[in-house]
Amino acid sequence: MNKYVVSTILVMISTFFSRIMGFVKIKIFSYYFGANLDADIFNYVFNIPNNLRKILSEGAMTSAFLPEFTHEKNKSHEKAVSFFRTVITFNIISIGLIVLVMIIFAKPIMYFISYYRGENLIFASSVFGYLVLYILLISLSSIFVSVLNSYKIFFIPSFSPIMLSFGIILSIFLFYGRFGIYSAVIGVIFGGFLQFLIPFANCLMIGFAWKPTFYFREKVFLNFLTRWLRMIFGFSISIITQQISFALASTLEIGSVSILSNAVVYYQLPVGIFYISIATVIFPKMAEHAVLGNNIKLNALLVDGIKILLLIFIPVSFLMFIWSDYILNLFLMGGKFSIYDTQKTASVLKCFLLGLLFYSMFGFFQKYYFSIRDAKTPFYLSVLFSILDIAISVFGINYYGLNALALAQSISFMICVIVFYFIILKRGVKIDLIEILFVLLKSIITLFPLYAIYFFFEKFQWDVGFSFKNLYFLMAAGIVSIFVLFICYSVLGINKLFRYIRRDAL
């Protein structure tokens, strides 16, 4: 089997376990804290550093870092190490200062970006002052992970996010009785440290030991910095958009922020297992082809990526849509998280799932442009997405409540993907629309037997809340659905589902 296919499958496996741990974390958090005001404030505040990491670490920074690092690595190992050390040094100084400022001015920051006042503002500011420490840990971790990915080491670094969920779960079990909601805060910091430690140790093993290096005037670093600053604007817009969504949710009934946050976690399951796994493996290869000027292979990767996203996300989003009530009934409801909270979460999740395919394709198109060192086009599309998302959310929230926020995202991603498609065509990339539509048709055909399986299992007597009977039913339905899906792909002539990178593109 092709080594890139193997790498993708390994990343999918580790990401799957990471998401399962995330579900366990959400289940335990919801069981102990429910959808009350404290849980709302924690979820709202944690969403801020969790989003900031997209521009200060995992999103913008790694997208700017990896192409430059690949370029230096092709020159020599010494140049790659020098560039790596310079970026780490810059990270510690710059992001360390940002975190310090956030801690000092936690209260005015929370006053400005939230609707919380009085005691709720004091509580939110206190939680924020601790949680921002996570940004520094994850920003350093993301650089180490990028280095490992560049050397085709995917499995171990993709396993490290499990540590965050593990830290939160362990901390709640140990400290809930004494510290209440702050037990989750302790867990974020502890889990973030473990998440940093794993890729750090692996980088040491391949000869990337850090020591302070201040080559800030080197051309390669200035190129990285310029590209990163440009990308920050694009990622910042999407982050501000999501933060506005959470702010709008906080104006609705108590529990809305927690419901929205939980829906996002379950929505991110297929994103993490499939899209992020594919992008983790394919992006370094895209960057390599772009550096070498091999546009034919680069374009082949783009086209094959589109096909595999269609083949995966159409049936997966459909399965999650029809089974969402049963999944959340099993894994989320219980303790302080009521039937009403679970039903509301399922409703929001379904609205998110309508745009899952477009979300993944939007991110994939962004990766393509980052690989060719074009940060402007993704920025303009991010601006368009934000304008659409905010406008639809503000208009729709009075009519559709919390569901409007998820629908706004789905509609906005769909429009932006269509615009992205025509921009890519103008760049001269050849995309056979008939071939893509043929793959789309095959994916849609698989939905009929999948719904038949759902119709069969729906007739069973399901319990309310968690039970092993529900678990067995859901596992059986999942196994049968996956088996039937692969049979369908085989019958339809798609025998190599994960071979999205053609041999001629490698």
Curated annotation (Swiss-Prot):
Segments passing through the bilayer: 4-24, 86-106, 127-147, 153-173, 181-201, 232-252, 263-283, 308-328, 345-365, 377-397, 405-425, 436-456, 474-494
Any single Gene Ontology cellular-component annotation: plasma membrane
Name under which the protein is recorded: Probable lipid II flippase MurJ
Pfam families recorded: MurJ (PF03023)
Organism the protein comes from: Borreliella burgdorferi (strain ATCC 35210 / DSM 4680 / CIP 102532 / B31)
GO biological process, one term: peptidoglycan biosynthetic process
GO MF, one annotated term: lipid-linked peptidoglycan transporter activity
Entry's localization field: Cell inner membrane
Family per record: Belongs to the MurJ/MviN family.
Protein's membrane topology: Multi-pass membrane protein
Pathway: Cell wall biogenesis; peptidoglycan biosynthesis
CDD domains in alphabetical order: MATE_MurJ_like
Lineage: Bacteria, Pseudomonadati, Spirochaetota, Spirochaetia, Spirochaetales
Disulfide pattern: none
